[in-house]
From Swiss-Prot:
This protein is involved in the repair of mismatches in DNA. It is required for dam-dependent methyl-directed DNA mismatch repair. May act as a 'molecular matchmaker', a protein that promotes the formation of a stable complex between two or more DNA-binding proteins in an ATP-dependent manner without itself being part of a final effector complex. One of its GO terms (cellular component) is mismatch repair complex. This is DNA mismatch repair protein MutL. It comes from Yersinia pestis bv. Antiqua (strain Angola). InterPro entries: DNA_mismatch_repair_CS, DNA_mismatch_repair_MutL, DNA_mismatch_S5_2-like, HATPase_C_sf, MutL/Mlh/PMS, MutL/Mlh/Pms-like, MutL_C, MutL_C_dimsub.
Length: 635
């Protein structure tokens, strides 16, 4: 078959395959056109789930007689005229495909009148060449579009339409989403002659909650947390639901970019990540969020139905949304790690070359000066086995099976860096820290591989935080919470030149009292040593950087607590402060599993080998298996 230009009707029907998926798609496109026309009232009439009739009437600016024929043509639009316009879209529509595509798979009638015209005009397209016929009609200022017999000429498409109830349910959901985007517009939805939804205009922000309650329900409004966050050209506002009520609100997920409703994976991932430590795998967050961004920084022309966008600075937007939602959720009463203050001791210290400069939460194992090739091979094999187990955990993590698996790998520079959870309180008896001898590890000392520097194989984990391990020919219980605290204490103990600060993507504003401001000024050098860059102006502090172990913490809460602690001491050593911080940081996991335990112990063995040689009280408890076996075998 030779190459030929397709007839207009066939070309439009091909385009309709992307634009017109079902009756709800038609409603979305036509209502968005009404919004672009400046309508303040939109009436929607549906018959038989949209299969028989879809009528959209608005009081917008209307379409002049001269433009009616063009309105039904492909690639004809009043929204853009140049590439520069396309790169800064604020209107809902811009491709000029909707009306032509809809008219190719239905009987579409467009009636419109502008304020300058004394009479209205009606247009419809028919035939193979989609010729447009125009005739006078009676109509107020505004437009009415009637879509009759959708898919009448494409039986295959009509066959795939669902029941009347299902199709109207999709239409209802589209109208709900649009109503949440435009509080200033009154919208009425009728089905088979019966009024189903009536959303009155709510131009006053104080009235927005009324529409929010009518769409999302009183339960959402009761548990909603208002959010308002801004950074440069980025602004996010709206409501997120208290995680405690998520089990009843899982279907309430509405997100908008420049008032355009979205189901974007990056946005969903950022929100889900903010909630991940507060919800189990079966729960979903509930939210109504509005993201305002410079239109030059977002490309909306990447999805046929415009449900997804592409941000020019995707990581910035992702972290902005994550930080904003996280800051609001932290206002809820989440459990806080409670560790006893008794027995503070300095953390194990070692040479700086054992530290990785930046970019990951891993620390390198010191080189062994006196190790044979065979010993090194054994050490590499043990390390490789543990790393494979840790990698298996990352690949099987329940959250990565949710939406955004690709984005989690794409947007997080380190798979090991996760937002801190809010663990349950740990008994003080399990985390006491008796004084133990601490020696600096040098290259001249005994190598750090071999059984002397390994806890042993993890057999199982007893919730919430105890691992059963092989130990010295027997078994022992190990407290993962205590091991994690010692690891963080070691990571936070600075070398002579101090911890390296890691700049925050978005500087954090923190309100301080007089004592906290004084502590910030008096201990400025100490904070710099700990990798914390904090400046104070007019009673407000700006946090610009923290050391790597602190990046995933609740800094809005941790920094004031840290300054409050410093205000009680005129002089304090970096190691003492590292001990205090380790006791007040959130745990990585509320309930541990075997893979997480293996990953933690691998890091402890590399970074704190002294804990393997001389376990502190509360870390390890050997179990007398021989006595238990003797009891079982006793006759």
């Amino acid at each position: 078959m030779p190459i030929q230009i397709l007839p207009p009707q066939l070309a439009n029907q091909i385009a309709a395959g992307e634009v017109v998926e079902r009756p709800a798609s038609v409603v979305k496109e036509l209502v968005e056109n009404s919004l672009d026309a400046g309508a303040t009232r939109i009436d929607i009439d549906i018959e038989r789930g949209g299969a028989k009739l879809i009528r959209i009437r608005d009081n917008g600016c209307g379409i002049s007689k001269d433009d009616l024929a063009l309105a039904l043509a492909r690639h004809a639009t009043s929204k853009i005229s140049s590439l520069e316009d396309l790169e800064a879209i604020l209107s809902m529509g811009f491709r000029g495909e909707a009306l032509a595509s809809i008219s190719s798979v239905s009987r579409l009638i467009l009636t419109s009148r502008t304020a300058e015209q004394s009479e209205a005009w009606q247009a419809y397209a028919e035939g193979r060449d989609m010729a447009v016929t125009i005739k006078p009609a009676a109509h107020p200022v505004g437009s009415t579009l009637e879509v009759l017999d959708l898919f009448y000429n494409t039986p295959a498409r009509r066959k795939f339409m669902r029941t009347e109830k299902t199709e109207f349910g999709h239409i209802d959901e589209v109208v709900r989403r649009i109503a949440l985007a435009r509080f200033d517009v009154a919208i009425n939805l009728n089905h088979n002659g019966k009024l189903i939804r009536q959303y009155r205009a709510a131009p006053d922000p104080a009235q927005h909650e009324r529409r929010l309650a009518s769409i999302c329900g009183p339960a959402f409004l009761q548990h909603a947390l208002a959010i308002a966050w801004q950074h440069g050209d980025l602004n996010i506002h709206g409501w997120v639901a208290d995680p405690a009520a998520s089990h009843t609100l899982s279907e309430m997920q509405y997100c908008y970019v420049n008032n355009r409703m979205m189901r974007d994976r990056l946005i969903n991932h950022a929100i889900r990540q903010a909630y991940q430590d507060r919800l189990n795998d079966a729960q979903q967050p509930a939210y109504v969020l509005y993201l305002d961004i410079d239109p030059h920084q977002v490309d909306v022309n990447v999805h046929p139905a415009k449900h997804e966008v592409r941000f020019h600075q995707a990581r910035l937007v992702h972290d902005f949304i994550y930080q904003a939602v996280t800051a609001v959720l932290q206002q809820t009463n989440a459990p806080i790690l409670n560790i006893s203050e008794e027995g503070e001791v300095d953390a194990p210290r070692w040479q700086q070359e054992n530290r990785v400069a930046a970019g990951t939460n891993k620390y390198a194992q010191p080189e062994a000066a006196k190790s044979s090739a065979a010993e090194q091979a054994v050490a590499r094999e043990r390390s490789s086995a543990r790393e494979r187990a840790a990698l298996a955990y990352k690949e099987d993590h329940p959250y990565q099976k949710q939406q955004g698996e690709l984005y989690r790998q794409l947007l997080q520079p380190s798979a090991a860096a996760k937002p801190a959870t809010s663990p349950a309180a740990i008994p003080a008896s399990s985390v006491s820290s008796p004084s133990i001898p601490v020696q600096r590890i040098t290259q001249a000392e005994e190598p750090l591989h071999g059984d002397n520097y390994s806890f042993g194989r993890v057999l199982t984990v007893f919730p919430p935080c105890y691992a059963l391990i092989e130990y010295q020919g027997g078994v022992a219980l190990l407290s993962l919470a205590v091991a994690e605290r010692w690891l963080k204490q070691a990571q936070l103990s600075p070398p002579e030149e101090g911890l390296r600060p890691q700049p925050l993507l978005i500087p954090l504003k923190i309100t301080l009292d007089k004592n906290e401001i004084a502590a910030c000024q008096n201990h400025e050098k100490l904070l710099i040593t700990m990798g914390i860059e904090l400046s104070v102006e007019q009673g407000r502090a700006t946090l610009r950087a923290v050391s790597l172990p602190l990046r995933q913490q609740n800094l809005q809460k941790l920094i004031p607590e840290l300054l409050g602690y410093l205000s009680q001491h005129e002089e304090i050593s970096p190691d003492t402060l590292a001990t205090w911080l380790a006791r007040h940081l959130g745990s990585e996991h509320e309930v541990w599993n075997v893979s997480q335990a293996i990953q933690l112990l691998t890091e402890v063995e590399r970074l704190c080998p002294q804990l393997v040689q001389s376990p502190p009280a509360g870390l390890l408890q050997p179990i007398d298996i021989k006595a238990a076996l003797a009891t079982l075998t006793h006759e």
